[in-house]
Amino acid sequence: MTAPQISVALPVRNGANYLAEALDSILAQTYADFELHVSDNASDDATPAILADYAARDARVKVSRSAELISQVENMNRAVGLAQTQWVRMMCHDDLMRADCMEHTVAAIAIVSEAVALIGNDERHLFANGYCTPAVSDAPLQCSGGQEVIKRRFSGLGVAVVLPSITTATFRKSMFDEMGGFDDRWVHFDIFLWLRLLAERDYVWLSAQITINRIHGGQIAADARSALRSVFDYRAFIPEFVSEFGDKLGLTPVERARARLLPLGVAATSYASELQAGRWARVLRGLRLLPNAWLLPMIPLTARAIVKERRRLKALRPHVPAKMIYP
């Protein structure tokens, strides 16, 4: 029997609230030739019992428990490290896979070139009131050169190719290891690793909505908004990234300057979300932390971001209250 070519890596810490649903969706896949590696980060709720039950019933479930509490990012890296396959698909304990998620993923792997290191997919969103965004029809694969993706990301103050989240990401494990895994300095450790991967390799986007992202207040994104960490992380990361990969990417002086403006676009998007959620006090506190030179350009950028956000959420508002859209 040949070894699987792909594993699912699932990190968890006290995930008893949603874990069983996630495991059920993974193990019910139409494509079954994979292993599921779960890294339990010293959970002290019902998580260990749930995992033991599933491991006893399905040999594909491999559980490894950390004896000591480690950081979230360390546990992400630990989960990936448990996999021994060429490709790894990430999964969060609170999200769901469509029944043909792995089938679509493996079909993409079968046709991509050796230059491809990262595969992303589209997703639906599930809110606390039970509303799930409508499904759309699947469309063909889109393959992009990594350098093209980065340059488009750096243009237009961040309006560019969509990069995957944790649950929508599949990657070559060898490249993940070569890059040193996720960096726990950053709240957007996933996006920043993808950018580093794509400085070396190419990217494929699956427009099929084969995962469901559950929106709730315990997410990393919610933490990033609450502290406005996104802005300051981008401000620190971009110069470091340009210094490391700028020459390899052939970035012109103009492109380097645009890259350094990216945190402005991120800040505008963050503030637009906070304003839409009615968190004015948080925005005012955040503005005091920004460089003075940012304040004037932030006005039109934030206004533009608010217009875009309102358009994006127009279909959601009749179904989901703002406090659930922005937990």
What residues fall within each predicted segment?
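Short loop->beta transition adjacent to catalytic acidic/histidine clusters or analogous donor-positioning motifs
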Residues: 3-7, 27-38, 46, 59-62
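Conserved nucleotide-sugar donor-binding catalytic segment
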Residues: 8, 81, 98, 121, ...
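Short, well-formed alpha-helical segments that are part of the catalytic scaffolds
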Residues: 14-28
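A conserved acidic beta->alpha catalytic loop
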Residues: 40-49, 68, 92
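Glycine-rich, basic loop-to-helix element that forms the pyrophosphate-binding segment
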Residues: 66-83, 96
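Short aromatic/hydrophobic "clamp" motif used to bind/position activated sugar donors
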Residues: 88
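Conserved donor NDP-sugar-binding/catalytic core segment of glycosyltransferases
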Residues: 100-136
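C-terminal subregions of glycosyltransferases and related glycan-biosynthesis enzymes
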Residues: 154-159, 187, 192, 199, ...
